[in-house]
């Protein structure tokens, strides 16, 4: 079985891109985003940290940095099924987790402050939802810890509010699709009911809509990575391969895309197990 990474978490994973105002979206942010989608997570995290210092009010650097830190942590843990043991043996993981939690907390506080001033700020709603989704995905899948339920509910409410105000907010559409996918695939039936329900079908509909929308470059790329990840997990490997081929043209340095494509068609197209680790 192959384990192929993109992140992607969540996501969430995951991947992060942004529909940003001109104030937040300078070339340095694009550099951080491109590094992330090329699977150069340390570079992406460093660039995002520099952006935090240069624009104290921008939320995007916190989302990019926490996503990059999550993927660094995931890569450092490796493939061990015993996630707790792997974390204890990982020399770099405690500092990565500490940095992730610190930046998540700061970003959450900034987003909540913006929403106190303007409850209809759909970008603040999105970033609050996405930061919380990153937190939930890191703990649930990467660390194997069932925690973060308050973050889950805040993510769900924030993303739903953003989409109610702006149904064309494609980043929120992708993040909300990941909520549906996570609940549908990671929770028992009873827990799914408690968490408000989840639907893999709805997740694919949302991801496909966002991937096919006429959006800014990194917004579309994030949606395509999300759809690719879901397709890989669902063993719809022929379509996943076609998407990966398109993405590899824009992100030739992404060795995880290359690893996936190197397994095609022998592994991918015949439906044998291929696992990605790129959400959300």
Task: Label each residue range with its predicted role.
Residues 5-16:
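Bacterial N-terminal signal peptides
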Residues 16-24:
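Boundary at the C-terminal end of the N-terminal hydrophobic targeting segment
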Residues 24-27, 34-48, 57, 65-120, ...:
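Short coil/linker segments at helix-helix boundaries
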Residues 217-219, 230, 235, 241-280:
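Terminal, low-structured helical/coil segments at or just beyond the last alpha-helical repeat
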Residues 60:
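Acidic donor-binding loop at a coil-to-helix junction in glycosyltransferase catalytic cores
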Residues 54:
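Helix-loop segments that flank and shape redox-cofactor active sites
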Residues 1-2:
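N-terminal secretory signal peptides that target proteins for export/translocation
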């Amino acid at each position: 079985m192959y384990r192929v990474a993109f992140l992607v978490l969540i996501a969430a994973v995951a991947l992060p891109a942004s529909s940003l105002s001109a104030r937040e979206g300078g070339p340095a942010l694009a550099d951080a985003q491109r590094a992330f989608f090329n699977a150069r997570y340390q570079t992406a995290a460093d660039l995002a940290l520099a952006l935090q210092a240069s624009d104290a009010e921008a939320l995007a650097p916190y989302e990019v940095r926490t996503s990059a830190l999550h993927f660094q942590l995931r890569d450092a843990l490796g493939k061990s099924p015993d996630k707790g043991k792997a974390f204890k043996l990982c020399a770099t993981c405690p500092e990565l987790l500490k940095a992730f939690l610190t930046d998540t907390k700061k970003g959450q506080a900034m987003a909540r402050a913006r929403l106190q001033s303007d409850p209809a700020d759909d970008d603040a709603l999105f970033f609050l939802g996405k930061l919380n989704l990153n937190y939930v995905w890191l703990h649930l899948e990467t660390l194997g810890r069932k925690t973060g339920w308050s973050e889950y509910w805040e993510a769900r409410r924030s993303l739903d509010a953003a989409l109610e105000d702006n149904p064309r907010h494609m980043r929120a559409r992708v993040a909300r699709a990941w909520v549906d996918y996570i609940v549908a695939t990671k929770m028992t039936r009873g827990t799914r009911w408690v968490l408000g329900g989840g639907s893999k079908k709805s997740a694919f509909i949302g991801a496909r809509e966002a991937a096919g929308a006429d959006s800014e470059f990194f917004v579309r790329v994030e949606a395509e990575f999300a759809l690719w990840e879901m397709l890989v997990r669902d063993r719809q490997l022929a379509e996943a391969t076609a998407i990966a081929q398109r993405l590899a043209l824009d992100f030739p340095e992404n060795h995880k895309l290359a690893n996936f494509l190197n397994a095609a068609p022998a592994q991918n197209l015949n439906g044998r197990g291929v696992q990605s680790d790129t959400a959300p």
